[in-house]
Amino acid sequence: MVYKLVLLFCIASLGYSVEYKNTICPPRQDYRYWYFAAELTIGVNYDINSTIIGECHMSESYIDRNANIVLTGYGLEINMTIMDTDQRFVAAAEGVGKDNKLSVLLFTTQRLDKVHHNISVTITCMEMNCGTTKYDSDLPESIHKSSSCDITINGSCVTCVNLETDPTKINPHYLHPKDKYLYHNSEYSMRGSYGVTFIDELNQCLLDIKELSYDICYRE
């Protein structure tokens, strides 16, 4: 008799455990987007002819209010830090443009155009004299001079560098993730632009990123 009661109790418990009721969750208002925070163009003195799927790798961290991202690919290591910020890097993509130019799209969790940030960028030529420092200087913001960007270049392969924060355009064919990134930075006075050139004219380092093909960087 006791065995039958235990068996009935187990059956009843099993029947209760699989019972499922649909729960209607309230809609989200704070959608999680990737914000198109910056575009970095780097010219090199060796041939890079087209975007290579799987070439770019990335790692990111957020320590003591400093957001950092490290990218490797196309013979370069790019190390970028945004100081004293609430956001962090969430993704990056790289694409090859004309005349051996590499374009890097950088995405963060929040917009950059509300607060001026100091930025540090180190570019290392992985295959050409990577142990020598070619350039190390603090560049004032060339548009509004409200923040600064220090750029360090290790090696002899870089011909020009241009960094634009809060760009107002993006490749219409870039779909990673589809409909989940924003780039409508309407406050022009909050945008920034930094540039340095060695061989190329700086205007040759200004790519039309709407014409490039990009590949998302693989997260390590």
Swiss-Prot record:
Name of the gene: OPG038
InterPro entries: Poxvirus_M2
Residue positions the entry lists as glycosylated: N49, N79, N118, N154
Record organism: Vaccinia virus (strain Western Reserve) (VACV)
PTM field: Glycosylated by host.
Coiled coil (UniProt feature): none
Any Gene Ontology CC annotation: host cell endoplasmic reticulum
Subcellular location: Host endoplasmic reticulum; Secreted
Main location: host cell
Lineage top rank: taxon: Viruses
Keywords annotated in UniProt: Early protein, Glycoprotein, Host endoplasmic reticulum, Host-virus interaction, Inhibition of host NF-kappa-B by virus, Secreted, Signal, Viral immunoevasion
GO molecular function, one term: protein sequestering activity
Protein name: Early protein OPG038
Induction per the UniProt record: Expressed in the early phase of the viral replicative cycle.
Similarity section: Belongs to the orthopoxvirus OPG038 family.
